[in-house]
């Protein structure tokens, strides 16, 4: 259950990207796939709480409860999936991660998962929030979170700091999160262990989440970034 007030109003649309272009054949393919994705996918940027509740209800993601609360169902996953979490083994993580307790993922599998998630989202309505992690004005990260579900966008907007208008106008993400609950990963194709995957690439500054409707994965991914980088 997610508590919030409800109000009806107009919605503003903007298109945004969620992945930095990289060098190399695979990453170049991802870059061009993303450009095509931007052309045919509607991405709503920085909607406020009231707008997101309206979107969630319109999409059939939940319903209003007493007092204006938004009631949603997470589906099969009602908690985090720690055994499905992967960190891409790269130069900046190879000697810093305890691989005995953390699952690794190859760069190739991560790129394939990213491309497949982009393809899956084509033609769908998505939501992006430009937010700040950490209340410390000297040490914080700009996080761009793109979600398939409006209530996931509402959830993470409620937990992280919404930048000032000035900061938002000059916003450049330090890290990006892409969350697609309706996409299921394939262990044989993506180098994971189940249909649910949370994969982090510190080199590409990107988190991929799929196969779970539990919104807490967005929050926990941000905590992981802060714990590793700060």
Where are these regions (language model features)?
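Classical Sec-dependent N-terminal signal peptides that target proteins to the secretory pathway
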Residues: 3-8
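A noncatalytic interaction/capping subdomain that flanks phosphate/NTP-handling catalytic cores
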Residues: 11-229
């Amino acid at each position: 259950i997610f508590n919030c007030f409800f109000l009806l109003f107009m919605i503003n649309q903007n298109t945004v990207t969620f992945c930095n272009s990289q060098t190399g054949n695979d990453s170049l393919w991802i870059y061009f796939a993303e450009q095509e994705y931007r052309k045919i996918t509607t991405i709503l940027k920085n909607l406020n709480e009231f707008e997101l509740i309206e979107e969630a209800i319109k999409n059939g993601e939940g319903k209003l409860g007493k007092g204006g609360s938004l009631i949603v169902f997470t589906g099969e996953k009602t908690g985090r999936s720690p055994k499905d979490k992967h960190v891409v083994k790269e130069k900046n993580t190879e000697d810093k991660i305890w691989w005995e307790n953390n699952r690794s993922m190859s760069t190739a599998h991560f790129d394939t998962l990213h491309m497949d998630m982009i393809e899956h989202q084509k033609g769908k309505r998505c939501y992006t929030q430009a937010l700040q992690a950490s209340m410390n004005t000297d040490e914080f990260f700009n996080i761009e979170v793109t979600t398939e579900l409006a209530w996931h966008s509402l959830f993470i907007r409620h937990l992280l700091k919404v930048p000032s208008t000035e900061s938002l106008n000059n916003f450049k993400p330090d890290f990006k999160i892409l969350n697609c609950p309706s996409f299921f990963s394939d262990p044989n194709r993506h180098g994971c262990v189940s249909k649910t995957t949370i994969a982090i690439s510190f080199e590409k500054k990107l988190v991929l989440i799929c196969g779970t409707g539990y919104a807490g994965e967005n929050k926990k991914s941000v905590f992981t970034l802060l714990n590793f980088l700060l």
